[in-house]
């Protein structure tokens, strides 16, 4: 007797978070960190990567995600912590210079890489830098909109807030959306990928 149907197929989603809309290998990008040093996602290969998108002037949700990531970092076993790389990428490169990101990360005890571009202002290289960052946002399904622009410092940003967990090969395996996620369940997803 022959049965029709599928045997095997993709494995079930075993995570507390969601399956990414844009899955597969993560886009390998290079930006500058809060120490004005080049930082490449490729350098994190071999570790589980927690990757989010924030901005320092954000009054609420970005602070909540940073605090949750810090909780996860502080509550991982020491041997597990060595196998995880936390990373934050700005959605406000006009304000979030490396100096601003340094102050933000230091004041919150969030010493992982906080990334931006060298210059996102008007003109030559700065437009290319902004375009590169915009491409990164697109590859990670980050929507961003500026409004209320009165001058260079008086504007608001609204953005989606995905936090990805990438496996050791830098494949996007799980995403947590928004800021109201449970850090304990998030930590379980990180630990699952550490043990995988």
PLM regions: where:
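Short loop/turn microsegments at loop-to-beta-strand junctions
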Residues: 26-27, 48-49, 160-162
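Sec/Tat-exported extracytoplasmic proteins
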Residues: 48, 55, 73-80, 108, ...
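Structural microenvironment flanking redox-active thiols in thiol-disulfide oxidoreductases
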Residues: 66-134
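Thiol-/selenol-based redox modules, centered on thioredoxin-like
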Residues: 138-139, 143-196
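Secretory targeting signatures
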Residues: 1-12
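Short active-site neighborhood of thiol/selenol oxidoreductases, capturing the structured segment around
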Residues: 39-69
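N-terminal "domain-start" segment that seeds a small globular fold
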Residues: 11-42
């Amino acid at each position: 007797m022959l049965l029709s149907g599928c045997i095997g197929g993709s494995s079930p989603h075993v995570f507390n978070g969601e399956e990414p809309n844009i899955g597969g290998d993560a886009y390998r990008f290079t930006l500058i960190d809060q120490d004005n040093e080049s930082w490449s996602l490729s350098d994190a290969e071999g570790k589980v990567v927690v990757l989010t998108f924030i901005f320092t002037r954000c009054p609420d949700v970005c602070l909540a995600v940073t605090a949750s990531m810090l909780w996860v970092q502080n509550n991982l076993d020491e041997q597990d912590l060595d196998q995880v790389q936390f990373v934050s990428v700005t959605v406000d490169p006009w304000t979030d210079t490396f100096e601003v990101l340094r102050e933000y990360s230091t004041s919150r005890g969030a010493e992982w890489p906080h990334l931006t571009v060298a210059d996102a202002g008007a003109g030559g290289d700065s437009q290319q830098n902004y375009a590169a960052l915009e491409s990164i946002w697109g590859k990670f399904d980050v929507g961003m909109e500026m409004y209320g622009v009165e001058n260079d410092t008086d504007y608001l940003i609204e953005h989606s807030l995905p936090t990805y967990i990438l496996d050791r090969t830098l494949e996007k395996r799980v995403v947590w959306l928004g800021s109201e996620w449970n850090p304990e369940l998030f930590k379980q997803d990180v630990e699952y990928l550490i043990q995988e």
